[in-house]
Each structure stands twice: as structure tokens, then as C-alpha cells.
UniProtKB/Swiss-Prot annotation:
The lineage of its organism: Eukaryota, Metazoa, Chordata, Craniata, Vertebrata. The keyword Disulfide bond applies. Residues 8-58 form the BPTI/Kunitz inhibitor domain. This is Chelonianin. It holds the Pfam family WAP. Keywords: Disulfide bond, Protease inhibitor, Pyrrolidone carboxylic acid, Serine protease inhibitor. The keyword Disulfide bond applies. The modification Pyrrolidone carboxylic acid is found at residue 1. GO terms for molecular function: serine-type endopeptidase inhibitor activity. Residues 60-105 form the WAP domain.
Amino acid sequence: QGDKRDICRLPPEQGPCKGRIPRYFYNPASRMCESFIYGGCKGNKNNFKTKAECVRACRPPERPGVCPKTSGPGICLHGCDSDSDCKEGQKCCFDGCGYICLTVAPSGSP
């Protein structure tokens, strides 16, 4: 498991070849799978043929519940990367500036 997550932290790498192959990489800063152009050889393992493949490999599992609505710019802290960094009953939520663990509302009620 640790090795897989490490792959997902690697930067997108085009490689030395001159191909122009659309691929996807996981961007830990945005927590999204994003497109990049792969040259066709070498590079690293944060390189997926489809967005779905990237999401399956790298997106951390989400806990149920809804993050509370933000009111203002929030505190610029980076306290978590995913829900699994938070205690039970909390989610990793964007608070207007950074990501922090917050107690969630039950699903369906923001």
C-alpha cells in the first residue's frame, strides 16, 4: 500500500522520447487526476492510460458525510491530505484556504 501511494506523489514525467500520448497523473496538490503529454518511453509510474485508472489507483477512499459550509477565508493550515488522515467521524475538508479535519454532517444534510 505504501509503495502505491508513493507512486501517486511523483511528478508527471514526459520521458525522453518524442511521442505525444495523452495520459493522466495524480496531482496530490489538487487531489485530482490531471492530463499530461507522455513521450512514449521511460518516465515514472504516475502515468495512467485513463482517468478512471488513475482515480482507482491514487484517489484515497472518501468517508460518508458532508463537509460544513465555509464562512470566510478560513485558516491557512494544511492539516490533512485525505479523509484517512482524520479521526472517525471527520473528513478532510477545504475551509476556504487550507485542508483541515472537520466533523461532518450526515450525508444529504450540508
